[in-house]
Amino acid sequence: MATVDRWLLPDGIEEVLPPEAARIEIARRQVLDLFQSWGYELVVTPHIEYLESLLTGAGQDLDQRTFKVVDPQSGRLMGFRADFTPQVARIDAHTLRREGPSRLCYAGSVLHAQPRALSTSRSPIQLGAELYGDASPTSDVEVISLMLATLQLADVPDVHMDLGHVGIYRGLARAAGLSGAVEQQLFDAMQRKAVDEVQALTADLPKDLGSMLRALVELCGGREVLAEARVRLGRAPASVLAALDDLLAIADRLASRYPDLPLYFDLGELRGYHYHTGVVFAVFVPGEGQSIAQGGRYDDIGADFGRARPATGFSTDLKTLVTLGRAEVVLPTGGIWMPDSGDAALWQQVCQLRNEGQRVVQALPGQPLSAALEADCDRQLIQQDGRWQVLPLAQ
């Protein structure tokens, strides 16, 4: 084996070195403290588990992003988690089984067989929050607000938000009686804004339904889109009109809380269509081709675990937040150099200093005092007048 093969990492897999690792860890603690202040409880899920459980209710997209291995003990297929949401949904539905709303959060590494885009990591540190047990737009607004608070904590500049609702397309497609194959083709064409293809796929539908489905490609822009949608989708099924009402209620609340936040509406945006059931949202910043935070409603995700519950949530990549954010992360600097000594009094003082939050580095046999500088120490323990004292490091 060539030497280079011993340290070469796979594409999209990276290691994090000091001091960047310290910045990420400090940011993780700050975000989890933020989640806790909003009433969200931390859960820790397995890195790997049986595939049937890991992919339940998650859709085809997650299946394609999941690394799969065979468990040598059981012979069953297992997968490394590519997304926390199915696992957290299982905890809510099967383990906690609470009657009222449940607020849960998480932070940890995930592994992707395929990256979201060519330039993105396959080993992001995913963090997010999920609210179970309430189907109202109020829960969606809470989750979106927490997402924005997370970005504000990291001081990510120039954010703007995209909002959509997969229930609009889903309701029209159901009313049109589209076959699974045609619905998938139309879905693909919608995502590419391929107007000619959408026209061809809806040409044989009843006039009103075909016209409304074609309108989704054009219904994108500022807040005026919602008023226009009310007119162009006025003959839509009740579920579609209810979805528009929910989207308007969410937009009103967000505009009240964040008057300077640019909101963009795209009723043909079907991000997570096989996974989400209602409102979908994503945050973008200039210069980034992918969303930096995203989420939406995924009601009844716990049904396969024996308990269907309304659910809404968001996720983001912690490493991306630290990279894009302007928040100053103050790293601890300096330290105390401890000589190599078996003196019990020295050890007692070192323990006390560490308990007080001081950083104390043990000198190893043969290390000169100059090694203290490499260890980022600016003070040293010196025995004077029969006791150990912390003094400036002798240059």
From Swiss-Prot:
Listed InterPro entries: aa-tRNA-synth_II/BPL/LPL, HisRS-like_core, HisRS/HisZ, HisZ
GO term, biological process aspect, one: L-histidine biosynthetic process
Other facts: This function is generally fulfilled by the C-terminal part of HisG, which is missing in some bacteria such as this one.
A Pfam family the protein falls into: tRNA-synt_His
Protein name: ATP phosphoribosyltransferase regulatory subunit
Location(s), subcellular: Cytoplasm
Record's function text: Required for the first step of histidine biosynthesis. May allow the feedback regulation of ATP phosphoribosyltransferase activity by histidine.
Subunit structure: Heteromultimer composed of HisG and HisZ subunits.
Keyword presence, DNA-binding: no
Pathway it works in: Amino-acid biosynthesis; L-histidine biosynthesis; L-histidine from 5-phospho-alpha-D-ribose 1-diphosphate: step 1/9
Gene name linked to the record: hisZ
Lineage: Bacteria, Pseudomonadati, Pseudomonadota, Gammaproteobacteria, Pseudomonadales
Keyword terms of this UniProt record: Amino-acid biosynthesis, Cytoplasm, Histidine biosynthesis
Keyword Transmembrane in record: no
A GO CC term attached to the entry: cytoplasm
UniProt family annotation: Belongs to the class-II aminoacyl-tRNA synthetase family. HisZ subfamily.
